[in-house]
């Protein structure tokens, strides 16, 4: 009986160390910001290091017309479970970005792709006043990256309401915790350029081939 009691503290220490190691490993593998490309009241574009990513072919040279043409082909639906998925499929997918949002963010995405390292992705936030402008900010956010010949786009938030004042994060009455990222199903038109990247098994757009048909050679 005494020996069992003596082992209890040892087990407790081992379990604590296991949880600490697991938590430390999980945190270390999260993407983190390495530099801010641009920040104003309308858009924030930054570079994030992605420890788990297969190296991208960054830096990449694209102009604003080219990237705008590619992003204009994207639409999405929020991923739903059954039976909500049946109803969601009846609604046409939404465009990834409106034209005014594209004009605001694309120049800085182009700059980000030109500066990104192979282990970095370009993260963006498009901002607007929230439902309660004094406390919230409307945020559409995601990231883009290039692994030739594919351009990857991930949407994490779509017009989500983000708290403005970070100082209230631990106020239980008015928590300022940002919403969790959602999962979205992305589509691209024309569909023949929407393929699976064999390196990651994720869908992406064959953007070089698409641009040959979307933009005249004189403008490329």
Regions found by a protein language model. Name each.
Residues 19-45:
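Bacterial Sec signal peptide processing site at the extreme N-terminus
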């Amino acid at each position: 009986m005494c020996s069992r009691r003596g082992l209890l503290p040892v087990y407790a220490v081992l379990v604590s160390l296991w949880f600490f190691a697991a938590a430390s490993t999980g945190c270390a593998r999260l993407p983190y910001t390495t530099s801010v490309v641009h920040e104003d009241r309308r858009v924030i574009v930054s570079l994030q290091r992605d420890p788990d990513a297969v190296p991208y072919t960054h830096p990449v040279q694209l102009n604003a017309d080219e990237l705008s043409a590619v992003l204009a082909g994207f639409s999405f639906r929020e991923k739903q479970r059954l039976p909500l998925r049946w109803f969601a499929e009846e609604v046409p997918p939404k465009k990834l970005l409106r034209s005014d949002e594209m004009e605001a963010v694309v120049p800085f995405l182009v700059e980000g792709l030109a500066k990104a390292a192979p282990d970095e992705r370009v993260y963006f936030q498009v901002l607007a006043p929230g439902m309660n402008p004094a406390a919230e900010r409307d945020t559409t956010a995601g990231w883009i990256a290039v692994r030739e010949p594919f351009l990857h786009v991930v949407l994490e938030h779509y017009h989500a309401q983000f708290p403005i004042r970070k100082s209230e994060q631990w106020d239980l009455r008015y928590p300022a915790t940002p919403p969790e990222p959602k999962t979205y199903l992305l589509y691209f038109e024309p569909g023949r350029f929407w393929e699976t990247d064999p390196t990651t098994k994720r869908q992406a757009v064959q953007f070089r081939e698409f641009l040959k048909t979307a933009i005249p050679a004189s403008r490329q």
